[in-house]
């Protein structure tokens, strides 16, 4: 009798997506042909030795040592002039590498003719040398879904079949030579749950930009193709500057001034490994004094590709504590490792929920409200997150919603109220970022709007497009179209339009959108718990 009563009281299970969007990335194919990689310096030397033998002679070796070292050229400028012939519909003076990218981009000739400048903008982005093999600080890969969000799924050496030609492949010979230089004990990276082409892209050091604010690029807009048959549309300047990078010792000295003194093993107990990456490990642990469960990232500093970002991320997290942000708790230097202690949210990332379950408008409104509260706090403290997406939203089992991953965040100052670096994740990028214009905090609002579409449709717009064409569509299409707009309420559609307004001045701010009528539909955060449980169960079943 009691069993039948219990069954009657249980709420119906939340709806699951018929086709999980959390699919293996190998299912996607953008027909992106990889570009050949420029030969590395050591390979050039090997070829020279084969042409000029005698390197094995001791006398020659001695002479080689005596030769003065000639440094690489600096402050040189390589200018590319690309034009567009409106009659033939072809670009003129386009580099071969760009031509190859364009051929595999699926951007039609009509689209190229319609907006050649947008095509060149996205080509410039892909050609940016600093996008190759860059990796965010504190990013790991793991097959453990509970670690998702703490173990970011955008590690640059995690390759999948559908990866776009951001990082050209290396030959087997070059690959072997690189592997010899790396630690043989490094575990192989696990394939990330999201397609590799949704990974975050980093093209300029945030620390460098903060330390010495530079004025936005005021390069004049080239004449349009309509005004001349063959106009110079684009100038690409490639400079190699002497950068004032911090030395490893300077970084360690700065970290020592930030971290706590003492042995973390005396403060935390019951360490349980939840993730492993090439540069470190993530554990859960208990604070002995409070009993609080925490996440601890243990990173080998020697294996961190951008050590300068460590200081940036820790300082931003430490100085910006908020109920809607995954809060930094503490950090320690233990030998060659940096241990960063953060809040632990056992619910996993929002990505698991959006890809495995169907959210209703009340639940979506609740998530949007919590995210806007986090963004309002950050923006009021002159911080732009720059990588808002479901992967960077963590959930507690009680339904709490918190923003994480400050590897790309930027501090803005009165002297530098706009930024012009290309960072973020392509499918969530605001148009002004794609077209490399100066931008402000409202780039986070656009990304939030794209994330709201994720919650409706299970994935961001253009995810199945070639990444280069997706960037073109973001730059030219304006507000992306919904698959089934008629299924959404008028108030929700208006909220999306306010977030995804092309005109930045008309786009809502976090403070303004917190007053939007759509947020009045928000259900209690506890309504997210059944979705979290259903997503965990679906993922567990799919892995069997």
Curated annotation (Swiss-Prot):
Give the superkingdom in one word.
Answer: Eukaryota
Q: How is it modified after translation?
A: Autophosphorylated when activated by CDC42/p21. Neddylated.
So what EC number does this one have? 2.7.11.1
GO CC annotation: cytoplasm; endosome; glutamatergic synapse; postsynaptic density
Task: Return the annotated region ranges for Linker.
Answer: 84-267
What residues does ATP bind to? Answer: 274-282, 297
Q: What is the documented function of this protein?
A: Serine/threonine protein kinase that plays a role in a variety of different signaling pathways including cytoskeleton regulation, cell migration, or cell cycle regulation. Plays a role in dendrite spine morphogenesis as well as synapse formation and plasticity. Acts as a downstream effector of the small GTPases CDC42 and RAC1. Activation by the binding of active CDC42 and RAC1 results in a conformational change and a subsequent autophosphorylation on several serine and/or threonine residues.
This chain's protein is named: Serine/threonine-protein kinase PAK 3
